[in-house]
Amino acid sequence: MTMAPHNPLLKYYDFGKDMKVDSIRHNGGCFAYFGEGSIIPEGTEIFMRYDYDTVAVNSRAQIHGEVSTWAYKANDKSGRVVMTGSHPEAVVSGERLQFMAAMVQYAMEGNGQPTVKGELRPNEIRQMIKGTADNDPAYTAIGDRQYHHFTLTVPKGVKKARITLNGIEGKDNFDLSLLAKEGDFAFHRTAHLQDVSLGCDKTLVIEKPKAGQWYIAVRCETTVETRNGKYGTEYIGRRDVLNGVPYTLCVTFE
């Protein structure tokens, strides 16, 4: 495969400085079609093209010069998808391994910015109880290892802000964490306050909170386990979490 001069994968490795990666296994599979009638979305990045005379090896399709590796990121809030039509995934050394590693790194670098589910208002119970099929993510139950982020506007003069998280009866045998941070998204490594105890029900009390915008987060700690089965990876353990964990949030000021 030959590399485009602007290839972002070059930030991770130089690939021998010849702008090529040689001898990547190809099973006569796909390439990205950018010709007439193409449905490739605008903004798709082209990284590499095939340097391969398929006619010489009696292939059904000529792929020389076609796009072999590409990526797409819809916006700042979405992730990045990086694709290739060949198979570098089983290689354990050299430039082909670097190629696979660079694709993974570029995809991870393209993680979307966190989004806010909504504003928490004093004395209003926010019910996060809907299912994915309801197509209403602002009020959908949380999935395993997910964060849900909310904002909270604290006025001047508040002595205490109390944030209460509750599970839903009959569906509360899960572990949820509750986090708070002033001025920015709350994660485990950055939160000013957090309760990571077992169970769903939590309460955070912020003494003399600074006026302005706070970020409140809920994280589902319960997750599935995996094992190798007859047909590949299987989920075991807490598979019920895959249906989502419903909960409610309420804020009060004193």
Functional labels for PLM-detected ranges:
Residues 158-170:
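Short amphipathic, basic-aromatic surface patches that mediate peripheral association
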Residues 1-95:
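Catalytic beta-strand/loop cores that center a nucleophilic Ser/Cys/Thr
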Residues 1-2, 57-146, 233-254:
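Extracellular ligand-binding/catalytic regions of CAZymes and related secreted enzymes
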Residues 92-93, 167-175, 224-226:
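Extended, low-complexity, turn-rich repeat/linker tracts enriched in Gly/Pro/Ser/Thr and Asp/Glu
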Residues 116-134, 138-160, 179-198, 206-254:
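C-terminal edge strands of extracellular/lumenal beta-sandwich accessory domains
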Residues 88-89, 168, 183, 221:
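Residue-level signature for short turns and capping positions that connect secondary-structure elements
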